[in-house]
Curated annotation (Swiss-Prot):
This is Putative transcription factor kapC. The gene is kapC. One of its GO terms (cellular component) is RNA polymerase II transcription regulator complex. Residues 97-120 are annotated as: Basic motif. Residues 79-89 have a biased composition (Polar residues). It is found in: Nucleus. InterPro entries: AP-1-like (IPR050936), bZIP (IPR004827), bZIP_sf (IPR046347). Belongs to the bZIP family.
Length: 280
């Protein structure tokens, strides 16, 4: 076994010498050509020279070791830096684009949300203003309605005072009896004496006004009740009816004293039962 291993050191020395020569040549080439950006690496050259060395000593080198070195060693060293150098700019280029797009989308979504929110708020504010205006208009209409109702009641009272006639009522109220005026007899002179006895109906003439007044009061009360019910006043109908009835009664009282005076002035002149002249 020892004589077979004797030429192995000489082969290694020869390979080392070849590598040394190649390194010197590479350094000399680098010095002579300084303008090149990247000098040729000396590492890939030994694998090209390796097939010459094993050709000489194929019997001395283990095939398992030589196969592992030939398959695994050379292809890994040159490919790794190229792959990393090509992938790094792609990964760095994609990340800023994705983040910028996402940020732009977020800003656009926030802007659209703010616009929708502002539009909805403006719409609600417009509705609130419209409702406030409607409420004010309704209040003004209510106040005007109350004023018109009071004005109508005052007009009715004045019409009744000026005309003295009751307007037509529904069929459930009977007002078919006409109002008859009281006949006023002529006033005799004071110088002449009246010996004739008065007619038997003279003392009964003052009674029709007193009998007619309650009927007119009843008619006015019924008219007031119907008017208040038709208008739908907020006040109770009894208060309005009493108010109008009291006004009518007060006006009737203002008229009645004059009628009483005329009647009182006329009665002594007509009632002469004893047949003696009256001394004025």
């Amino acid at each position: 076994m020892q004589p077979a291993l004797a030429p192995h050191p000489s082969a290694q020395d020869h390979a080392d010498q070849v590598l040394h020569d190649q390194l010197l040549a590479a350094q000399h080439q680098h010095l002579t050509h300084p303008q090149q950006a990247r000098p040729q690496p000396p590492a890939p050259q030994p694998p090209h020279m390796q097939p010459n060395t094993p050709a000489r000593d194929q019997n001395n080198i283990d095939p398992a070791i030589s196969g592992a070195t030939m398959l695994t060693g050379p292809p890994q060293t040159p490919t790794q830096p190229d792959v990393t150098g090509q992938e790094t700019p792609k990964t760095y280029g994609k990340r800023p684009l994705s983040t910028s797009k996402r940020a732009a989308q977020n800003r656009a979504a926030q802007r659209a949300f703010r616009q929708r929110k502002e539009a909805h708020i403006r719409e609600l504010e417009g509705k609130v203003k419209a409702y406030e205006n409607m409420g004010e208009a309704i209040k003004a209409l209510q106040a005007e309605n109350y004023q018109l109702r009071e004005y109508i009641i005052n007009l009715q009272s004045r019409l009744l005072d000026s005309q003295g006639e009751v307007p037509e009522l529904p069929g459930n109220i009977d007002l078919s009896q006409p109002r008859s005026e009281i006949p006023v007899p002529p006033i005799p002179n004071s110088g002449t004496t009246t010996t004739a006895a008065p007619p038997p109906t003279a003392p009964q003439q003052p009674q029709p006004p007193h009998a007619q007044a309650p009927t007119s009061n009843d008619d006015m009360n019924s008219l007031n009740r119907i008017a208040v019910a038709g208008l739908g006043m907020r006040k109770p109908p009894t208060e309005e009816a009493n108010y109008l009835g009291n006004n009518f009664q007060a006006q009737a009282r203002r008229v009645r004293p004059d009628e009483g005076q005329t009647e009182a002035s006329e009665l002594p002149k007509q009632e002469q039962t004893h047949g003696l002249p009256l001394i004025s």
